[in-house]
């Protein structure tokens, strides 16, 4: 239960971004009596769930849905409507976030169409400067501007002479009618787009560079996540869990090699789609391995084959772009943030990050609750952080865990294992309440 903050020490916090993470942070802070100013680049709440967002950063396409079940994705104290779909679309998620902002009286604290130009430490506080002039000082800043605003492109992008676009720019399938289209990648957006366009294209091909397990969205009439939740136990080693998932997937889809993919032997980000494999059965989609080179419209693959395409849609991920922060505080190589428990910069008191992760199973929004609650406790002085050296040791432990269990590609730079993370966070919060204040 959140208790009101000590009104004798009135805190003032800037939150950057009115997407799911920013709204959640604002809600927890406001509940403690903290003065919150939320800066939003666009003209509405919802972040990446706003179709054709006028902030210029939105990746939403017309067929976009949640990949995790609504009941395990929702904020802890604000469920989706009980009579709604299991997997809401972007319109329903946007309405949900709008309702959340209204329910917790967040809207009046938001400044829309406000671009943050610079955030810098100043006289024991944080100075936030806006584009067009004007600056304000805050006791703390929460960066919740998301990590899907700046697309990353393959090295051969300029070698392809047909139409090229990143999945970030995709909206609807109609412009690709009767074309030969190559979709690069096996992330959620890539498989969504391939399944979306294949009903109108002449041919649709997916290039999967890395091994992938395409799990069914439903098993035995319920979401697959529910089945896994009952079968998988905390004590189970990962190889046993992986074998279980391969068996369940094989019952529904067969072996991945049957469709041109390679079954992974390490942990990978889960891929799931309700109709992707059906399109393979109907020969609407075919698979190819990774790309060696591109010349004109001809693409050469690692298996020695080649094919010509009219359009390439690259689902090749994003770089984390935080131009308003000093270079030393920005992501390493544009991908990995050096943060203690994904929230705190060890050398910058009062600078917090929210929602800068990809959950390996489950819903991102639910994890944002945990982060926002912790940030609020830190802002209000309920918990005390360890020394920077200790924070860095914990950060290295987490990176070591990720290196052991996940591929080393940029896609996994923000990967977050929910079980491991929650154990770490619970342990830190217990210790933080016991540390003496300074």
Task: Go through each PLM region and give its residues.
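Long alpha-helical segments found as membrane-embedded helices
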Residues: 395-403
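Flexible "cap/lid" subdomain of the alpha/beta-hydrolase fold that forms the substrate-access gate
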Residues: 65-68
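Flavin (primarily FAD) cofactor-binding/catalytic cores of flavoenzymes
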Residues: 2-63, 74-218, 229-388, 403-438
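Charge-dense, low-complexity polyampholytic segments
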Residues: 389-393
């Amino acid at each position: 239960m959140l208790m009101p903050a000590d009104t004798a020490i009135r805190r003032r916090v800037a939150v950057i971004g009115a997407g799911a993470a920013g709204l959640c942070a604002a809600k927890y802070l406001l509940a403690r009596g903290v003065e919150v100013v939320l800066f939003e680049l666009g003209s509405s709440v919802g972040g990446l769930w706003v179709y054709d967002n006028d902030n210029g950063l939105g990746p939403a396409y017309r067929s976009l849905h949640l990949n995790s079940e609504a009941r395990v994705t929702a904020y802890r104290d604000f469920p989706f409507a009980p009579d709604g779909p299991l997997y809401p679309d972007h319109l329903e998620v946007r309405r949900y976030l709008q309702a959340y902002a209204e329910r917790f009286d967040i809207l009046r604290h938001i400044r829309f169409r406000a671009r943050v130009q610079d955030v810098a430490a100043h006289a024991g506080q944080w100075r936030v400067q806006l584009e067009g002039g004007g600056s304000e000082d805050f006791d703390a800043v929460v960066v919740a501007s998301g990590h899907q605003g700046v697309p990353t492109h393959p090295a051969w992008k300029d070698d392809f002479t047909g139409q090229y676009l990143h999945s970030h720019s995709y909206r609807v399938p109609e412009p690709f009618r009767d074309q030969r289209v190559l979709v690069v990648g096996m992330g959620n957006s890539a498989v969504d787009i391939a399944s979306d366009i294949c009903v109108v294209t002449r041919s649709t091909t997916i290039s999967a560079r890395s091994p992938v397990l395409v799990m069914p969205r439903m098993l035995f009439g319920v979401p697959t996540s529910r089945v896994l939740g009952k079968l998988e136990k905390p004590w189970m080693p990962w190889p046993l869990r992986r074998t279980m998932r391969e068996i369940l997937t094989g019952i529904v889809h067969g072996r991945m090699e049957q469709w041109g993919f390679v079954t992974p032997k390490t942990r990978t980000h889960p891929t799931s789609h309700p109709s992707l494999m059906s399109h393979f059965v109907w020969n609407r989609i075919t698979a190819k391995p990774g790309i060696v080179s591109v010349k004109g419209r001809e693409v050469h693959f690692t298996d020695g084959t080649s094919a010509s395409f009219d359009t390439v849609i690259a689902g090749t991920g994003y770089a984390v772009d935080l131009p308003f922060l000093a270079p030393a505080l920005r992501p390493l190589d544009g991908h990995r943030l050096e943060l203690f428990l994904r929230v705190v910069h060890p050398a910058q008191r009062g600078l917090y990050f929210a929602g800068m992760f990809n959950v390996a199973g489950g819903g991102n929004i639910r994890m944002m609750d945990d982060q926002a609650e912790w940030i609020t406790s830190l802002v209000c002085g309920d918990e005390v952080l360890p020394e920077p050296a200790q924070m860095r040791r914990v950060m290295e432990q987490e990176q070591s865990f990720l290196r052991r269990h996940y591929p080393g590609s940029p896609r996994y730079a923000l990967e977050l294992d929910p079980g491991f993370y929650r154990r770490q966070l619970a342990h830190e919060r217990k210790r933080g309440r016991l540390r003496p204040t300074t």
